[in-house]
């Protein structure tokens, strides 16, 4: 019997994870990263129902420093971040994981839909996609290292969402019914309103321009646009145009025809490998957005922590700031943050 710490939010996934760990006969305690009283109360209610010791870590300061601050800064710089990447790397599998181990946990369990297994060849733990491709969350976990993977339990990785809900309901768990929103700290996932309230003074109107620098109109501020956007531009040009990029020096949003959104390659930075670093030209599948389909590509590592990825076919709207995760079959090779697209 092992001691297992469960990261508990009070939602159906983490609540069912706690249930499964208890049913497996482990000594279980729960940990909650609290950014507000509501989250702490919901998690405490579930933990009490299951009869498990519960601990709350107030990470509001760290959350501001490691997640919200960089999120805002990225948008101000014309990048489109995925805050879940930083939250999982630095907080859930950083601060929370370390606290769990310090308090005696042999293993750390979460409600993520992914799988972990040890493979004798290459002699390490590997991260795999979930059995249910509709719920797979391996994309946001590519920064996990061997220390964490060796202690990680992901009991939902072999289950469907429907099965998880059925288990929770059958047990009578008082879980939070609502599905998690895409950005947990942004009401209604309306990031534009959030940015305007948080850093409106740093947002300035500027010109829409084409590739030649011709002014086509005025925009409301670089953070309110993302690569590939067509709607909401307010341009009446007699032809459809899309956001292609940004010119920070001119505070300009570059727009143009859709065909200019397609690129065959990109550069990634802050690259981390779970499998051994591949040789240059290794065939992989690269996933450039959370719900995008991974596409065949060649991976060219550029030590110490960058990589160039070349697709077999051009991809639409490769977006700086988004994570790019590299797969071979169902195994996660590694991943990084898109720096720029390359034709």
Swiss-Prot record:
It is an enzyme of class 2 (transferase). Its EC number is 2.8.1.13. Its main location: cytoplasm. One of its GO terms (cellular component) is cytoplasm. It is found in: Cytoplasm. Residues 135-137, 289-290 are annotated as: Interaction with tRNA. Signal peptide: none annotated. Disulfide bonds join 87-184. CDD domains: MnmA_TRMU-like. It catalyses: S-sulfanyl-L-cysteinyl-[protein] + uridine(34) in tRNA + AH2 + ATP = 2-thiouridine(34) in tRNA + L-cysteinyl-[protein] + A + AMP + diphosphate + H(+). The active site is at 87 (nucleophile), 184 (cysteine persulfide intermediate). GO terms for biological process: tRNA wobble position uridine thiolation. GO terms for molecular function: ATP binding; tRNA binding; tRNA-uridine 2-sulfurtransferase activity. ATP binds at residues 7-14, 33, 111. Coiled coil: none annotated. It comes from the Bacteria. InterPro entries: MnmA-like, MnmA-like_C, MnmA-like_central, MnmA-like_central_sf, Rossmann-like_a/b/a_fold. The record marks 112, 322 as: Interaction with tRNA. Keywords: ATP-binding, Cytoplasm, Disulfide bond, Nucleotide-binding, RNA-binding, Transferase, tRNA processing, tRNA-binding. PANTHER family: MITOCHONDRIAL TRNA-SPECIFIC 2-THIOURIDYLASE 1, TRNA 5-METHYLAMINOMETHYL-2-THIOURIDYLATE -METHYLTRANSFERASE. Catalyzes the 2-thiolation of uridine at the wobble position (U34) of tRNA, leading to the formation of s(2)U34. Belongs to the MnmA/TRMU family. This is tRNA-specific 2-thiouridylase MnmA. It comes from Desulforudis audaxviator (strain MP104C). The lineage of its organism: Bacteria, Bacillati, Bacillota, Clostridia, Thermoanaerobacterales.
């Amino acid at each position: 019997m092992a001691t297992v710490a469960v990261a508990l939010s009070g939602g159906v996934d983490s609540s069912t994870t706690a249930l499964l760990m208890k049913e497996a006969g482990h000594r279980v305690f729960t940990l909650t990263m609290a950014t507000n009283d509501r989250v702490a109360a919901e998690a405490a209610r579930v933990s009490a129902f299951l009869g498990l010791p519960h601990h709350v870590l107030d990470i509001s300061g760290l959350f501001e420093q490691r997640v919200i601050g960089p999120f805002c800064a990225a948008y101000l710089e014309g990048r489109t971040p995925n805050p879940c990447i930083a939250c999982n790397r630095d907080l859930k599998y950083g601060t929370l994981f370390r606290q769990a181990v310090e308090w005696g946990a042999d293993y750390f369990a979460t409600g993520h839909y992914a799988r972990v297994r040890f493979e004798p060849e290459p002699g390490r733990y590997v991260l795999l996609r979930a059995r249910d491709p509709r719920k797979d969350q391996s994309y946001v976990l590519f920064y996990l290292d061997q220390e964490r993977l060796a202690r990680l339990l992901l009991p939902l990785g072999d289950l469907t969402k429907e099965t998880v809900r059925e288990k929770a309901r059958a047990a009578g768990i008082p879980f939070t019914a609502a599905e998690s929103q895409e950005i947990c700290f942004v009401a209604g996932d309306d990031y534009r309103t959030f940015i305007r309230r948080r850093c409106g003074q740093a947002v300035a109107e500027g010109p829409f321009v084409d590739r030649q620098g011709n002014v086509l109109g005025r925009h409301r501020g670089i953070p309110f646009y993302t690569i590939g956007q067509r709607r909401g531009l307010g341009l009446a040009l007699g032809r459809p145009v899309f956001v292609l990029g940004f010119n920070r020096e001119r505070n300009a949003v570059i727009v143009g025809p859709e065909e200019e959104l397609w690129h065959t390659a990109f550069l990634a930075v802050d690259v981390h490998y779970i499998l051994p670093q591949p040789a240059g030209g290794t065939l992989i599948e690269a996933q450039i957005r959370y719900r995008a389909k991974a596409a065949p590509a060649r991976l060219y590592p550029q030590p110490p922590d960058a990589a160039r990825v070349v697709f077999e076919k051009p991809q639409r709207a490769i977006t700086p700031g988004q994570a790019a995760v590299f797969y071979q079959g169902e195994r996660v090779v590694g991943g990084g943050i898109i720096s720029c697209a390359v034709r």
